[in-house]
Amino acid sequence: NLCEELPDVDFHYALGVDLGFIDSTAFVVVGWSDSAPETYVLEVSKFTHLTSDDIGKKIKWLDGEYEFERIVADTGGLGKMVVEEMSKRFSLNILPAQKRAKHDHIELLNSDFKKGKLQIYDTEENQLLIDELELLEWDLNERTKGRFIERSDCENHACDAMLYVWRESLAFLHQSETFQPLLGSDEWYKAEEAKMEAAAEAKVVGDVGNWWEEHGPDPVYDEILN
């Protein structure tokens, strides 16, 4: 899911922000196009000890570079006051991040990773996000209680910013222009055979995965960087 080159298309841009002070404040820029189904993570940055003024200036500068269609930020806790202050002071339209059903949306995001519909532009600065994705795990103690909560000793700020802005991206509205084969045609039977083979392979992989889930770590974002 790492891409070395971006497609030559007209992108729509959006920004996700996860607010912090002692913890990192993370900024994640994504782009998508009307002509392709993929969403691309274009730019990632993280900073500690940023004031609301610092954050507002950073967002304003990024907006000048990308001309965002959407800007979303975590408004939990004091975040709502910070976002309202920045929006007024810097004339920004910052939307509250959608945070309900986080685990369900992480699963959907993982699905997009596995399908190749979510790509990360392979740059040095974006390694900040990749490191989080590779290390972030669910808290096993919470899992025994039936709750999906990330381990508190794992960084998740860039991941959260990505999740916020991915939920706002419109790439999922893209409809493929390829035609489905006619029912009963040779192409249809070939497609069905390929589906059956993929299902059989997935079962084998799933059996191995179940063993790993029982005996190994419990990653939040899995099988995404193949």
Predicted segments, located by residue:
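Mg2+-dependent endonuclease catalytic cores in nucleic-acid-processing enzymes, primarily RNase H-like
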Residues: S35-R147, F172, Y189-N226
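Catalytic-loop motifs flanking and including active-site residues across diverse enzymes
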Residues: D23, I55, H157-A161
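Acidic, Mg2+-coordinating catalytic module of metal-dependent nucleases/exonucleases
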Residues: R147-G184
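Short beta-strand scaffold segments in enzyme catalytic cores
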Residues: T25-V30, L163
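ATPase catalytic-site recognition across NTP-hydrolyzing enzymes
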Residues: N1-V17, E223
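Generic structural signal for hydrophobic core residues of well-folded globular domains
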Residues: G31, E137, V165-S169
